[in-house]
């Protein structure tokens, strides 16, 4: 077990024989689950985990196929991710979580909630995928960075997505490149 950041614990479990990594922080009866977007990982939420963990037990999985979770050759359909969340919640003992999803994670959260309405306390969507009919420059840059992970493509993608105008931390760029170079990460 590794400490990823102050007060954030890294854990692993198995779903259908696949290793799933997740981060956990806080000690509350109220649970908040954060779902990352396409090509991202749990690290995408590191800056807000300490804030949320003051009020919630925060659980942040690397979705199956992403981050440091296994990347099986599978058909990554909405139903596949719904099944993943069902098993993840069951194995971690999570009941009636607050659920926040960003990008692809938002689409997964919305799909899950629509079929499990009585099992989610609150749903918050942050720029959910599936609502746009065309691409954007930021999405195009992100796809290029995922396909050709190097310092320049990653920095370009993250700079286009950074709304505050602040410089993207080097550990975000380095971590992204490392995860995109893992086997089956594309």
Question: Where are the regions a protein language model picked out?
Answer:
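Alpha/beta-hydrolase fold catalytic core
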Residues: 1-32, 54-56, 94-95, 159-163
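Active-site loop/oxyanion-hole signature of alpha/beta-hydrolase fold enzymes
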Residues: 15, 23, 60-101
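Conserved HGGG/HGGXW glycine-rich cap/lid loop of the alpha/beta-hydrolase fold
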Residues: 18-68
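Conserved alpha/beta-hydrolase "nucleophile elbow" surrounding the catalytic nucleophile
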Residues: 36-38, 97, 101-106
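Conserved catalytic-core motifs of eukaryotic protein kinase domains, centered on the activation segment
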Residues: 44-46, 69-75, 134-137
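Flexible "cap/lid" loop of the alpha/beta hydrolase fold
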Residues: 107-115, 120-150
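Conserved alpha/beta-hydrolase catalytic His-Asp/Glu region
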Residues: 133-138, 147-186
């Amino acid at each position: 077990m590794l400490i990823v950041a102050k007060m954030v614990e890294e854990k692993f479990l198995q779903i259908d024989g696949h290793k799933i990594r997740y981060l956990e922080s806080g000690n509350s009866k109220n649970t908040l689950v954060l779902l990352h977007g396409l090509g991202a990982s749990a690290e995408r939420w590191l800056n807000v985990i300490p804030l949320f963990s003051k009020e919630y037990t925060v659980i942040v999985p690397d979705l199956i196929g992403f981050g440091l979770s296994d990347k099986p050759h599978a058909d990554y359909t909405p139903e596949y991710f719904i099944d993943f969340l069902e098993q993840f919640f069951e194995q971690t003992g999570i009941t009636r979580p607050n659920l926040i999803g960003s990008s692809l994670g938002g689409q997964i959260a919305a799909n899950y909630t629509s079929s499990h309405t009585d099992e989610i306390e609150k749903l918050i969507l942050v720029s959910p995928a599936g609502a746009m009919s065309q691409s954007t420059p930021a999405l195009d840059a992100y796809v290029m960075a995922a396909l050709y992970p190097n310092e320049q493509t990653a920095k370009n993608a993250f700079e286009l997505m950074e709304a505050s105008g602040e410089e993207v931390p080097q550990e975000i760029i380095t971590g992204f490149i490392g995860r995109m170079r893992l086997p089956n990460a594309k």
